[in-house]
Amino acid sequence: MKNINPTQTAAWQALQKHFDEMKDVTIADLFAKDGDRFSKFSATFDDQMLVDYSKNRITEETLAKLQDLAKECDLAGAIKSMFSGEKINRTENRAVLHVALRNRSNTPILVDGKDVMPEVNAVLEKMKTFSEAIISGEWKGYTGKAITDVVNIGIGGSDLGPYMVTEALRPYKNHLNMHFVSNVDGTHIAEVLKKVNSETTLFLVASKTFTTQETMTNAHSARDWFLKAAGDEKHVAKHFAALSTNAKAVGEFGIDTANMFEFWDWVGGRYSLWSAIGLSIVLSIGFDNFVELLSGAHAMDKHFSTTPAEKNLPVLLALIGIWYNNFFGAETEAILPYDQYMHRFAAYFQQGNMESNGKYVDRNGNVVDYQTGPIIWGEPGTNGQHAFYQLIHQGTKIVPCDFIAPAITHNPLSDHHQKLLSNFFAQTEALAFGKSREVVEQEYRDQGKDPATLDYVVPFKVFEGNRPTNSILLREITPFSLGALIALYEHKIFTQGVILNIFTFDQWGVELGKQLANRILPELKDDKEISSHDSSTNGLINRYKAWRG
C-alpha cells in the first residue's frame, strides 16, 4: 500500500478548482439540465439493491476527478493488498482478512504463506454443530432442560455487530431469546439476569484474550449468579461457551475448551460478526441463514474487488463522502434506515467508521492537514423526522444523508409500509429541491389568504433545498441483502482510509482512557482524599467518594 498525502496529488488540486466551480451549483440546477440524471447516477447490485446517488452536488466531471484521486492514491493496489493477505495493518503488523471469513468460493487466501480457509471452515463447521444442538434442544442444561435464552457478553465489535444483525433479522429468528450485555455498568447485566432462568440460559463470553475488563467483569457476575442457583462449578460447562483464543483462561473459568470458538488476529473487532463472534447470530437465525449473510457479503466483496471504480458502489459512495467532508466542510453523515428492525444499523457503523477512520496521524506518521473520518449518527425513519430532521432541512450545517429502505416489508399491516415509503421518497425530494418563497406564497393564495398579511411568517416556511442524499433501496431485508449492505459500508470505509492515507484497522485511541482507568481504579477502593491528578479530576474523584458514603 502506498503512503500518499492526498492533498499533494494533482487530482486533489484539480478537485479544489472544480469545487470553486461547483459550490454554488444546486441539485435542482443539475436535474433541470439533465432529465436522464437518475439513470446516469444510480446502479443496481445483484437485483437486490438500488443505489441512487443522483441527489448529490456532483456531475460526471466531479466523479471523474474523484476517480482520478483514487487512481493517484493507488486504490486498486490497496484492494489487492487487502484481499491477498498483505499485512496492511502495519501498526499491529497484521493482515486484514474479514473477507476470508465469508469467502464462499473457498479460493485459497494466504497469510504468511499459509492458506487460512481450512481453519475458517473448521470453525464454521464447529459453529454449525454446536448451534444445531442448542436450537434442536439436544443440548441440555444442568437440570436436563433445553436452552431457551442466550446471553452474549461482549463489548464493541463483540457486541455491536451481533446485536445489530440479530435485530435486523428478527423475522428469521427461531424460538431462542437473545440478550446482549456490554456495559460494565452493573445495571446492564443485572437487568438481563432478571429476565432469564439459570436452568435454561446459555452465556457466550466474547473476548479474544479473555481479559477485556468490561466483558470479564460481566462474565464473572453472570457466573456468580449462575452458581448461586446451580451450586456445583461443573455445571458451568453446560451453560457457558467462549469466543476466544485464550484456552488456559477459558478452562480456568470453567468452560469446556471444546466449546471455545476461536478467531484470528487478522480479524478486527468491528469486522468480526462474520467470525465466531457471530455465534449469537447463528443461534438466533440458524446456520443456513448465517451462511446466506456470509454469501451476501461475499457477493459484495467480489463486486468491490473486480468492478471498475467507475461502477464500483463502495468506491462511489466513498468518493462522494470525501467530496463533502474535505471540500464542502461537512463534518457528519447521517444513516437513516426506514425499517424498524434496522434500528441499530447507524450505531453499528458509528463504530465501524469512527473507530476505523477517526485518526489525525497519516500512514507516514505525520499529523494530517485535511479531514479524515466523519462523525456518523442516525436513527430509524420516521422517528428521526420528528426529532432532528429540522436541522437537516433548515439548519446551517450540511449533513449528507444515506436513506435506506426495503421495497418489501416483513410486516404488511394495512398500508403502514406505503406510508413509511412515501416518507422515504418524500424526504430526499424535499431535501434536494426544497420550497421557494414563491411556492409558499402561492400556497397561501390557494388557501384564500393574502401572502402580504402573512409576510412575517413566509421566510420560516422556505426550504433552500440543495441538501445531499443517497438512497439505498433494497428489494427486501434478507440475510443475503443485509450481508451485502454491511460489506458495502465496510468497503466504503476502507476506500476512504486508503485515499486519506490513514491506518483504518487499528484503534489506538481506545487505549489511553483504559490505561488511566486502570490507574484510577485502585484509588477508588478507599476513602482517602486524592491529589495525584489535575485539579478537575481530583475534584471529581473526591466528590464521588464524599457522596458514595
From Swiss-Prot:
Organism, as annotated: Escherichia coli O17:K52:H18 (strain UMN026 / ExPEC)
Organism domain of life: Bacteria
Annotated localization: Cytoplasm
InterPro entries linked to this entry: G6P_Isomerase, G6P_Isomerase_C, Phosphoglucose_isomerase_CS, SIS_dom_sf, SIS_PGI_1, SIS_PGI_2
Biological function: Catalyzes the reversible isomerization of glucose-6-phosphate to fructose-6-phosphate.
PANTHER family assigned: GLUCOSE-6-PHOSPHATE ISOMERASE (PTHR11469:SF1)
One term under GO cellular component: cytosol
E.C. no: 5.3.1.9
Protein name per UniProt: Glucose-6-phosphate isomerase
GO molecular-function term, one example from the UniProt record: monosaccharide binding
Catalytic site positions: 355 (proton donor), 386, 514
Keyword Isomerase applies: yes
Keywords: Acetylation, Cytoplasm, Gluconeogenesis, Glycolysis, Isomerase
Sites bearing N6-acetyllysine, chain numbering: 80, 228, 234
Listed Pfam families: PGI (PF00342)
Reactions catalysed according to its record: alpha-D-glucose 6-phosphate = beta-D-fructose 6-phosphate
Major localization class: cytoplasm
Keyword RNA-binding: no
Disulphide linkage map: none
Gene Ontology BP terms: gluconeogenesis; glucose 6-phosphate metabolic process; glycolytic process
NCBIfam families with a match to the protein in the record: PRK00179.1 (NF001211)
Family matches, as HAMAP family: G6P_isomerase
Family: Belongs to the GPI family.
Metabolic or biological pathway, per its Swiss-Prot or TrEMBL entry: Carbohydrate biosynthesis; gluconeogenesis; Carbohydrate degradation; glycolysis; D-glyceraldehyde 3-phosphate and glycerone phosphate from D-glucose: step 2/4
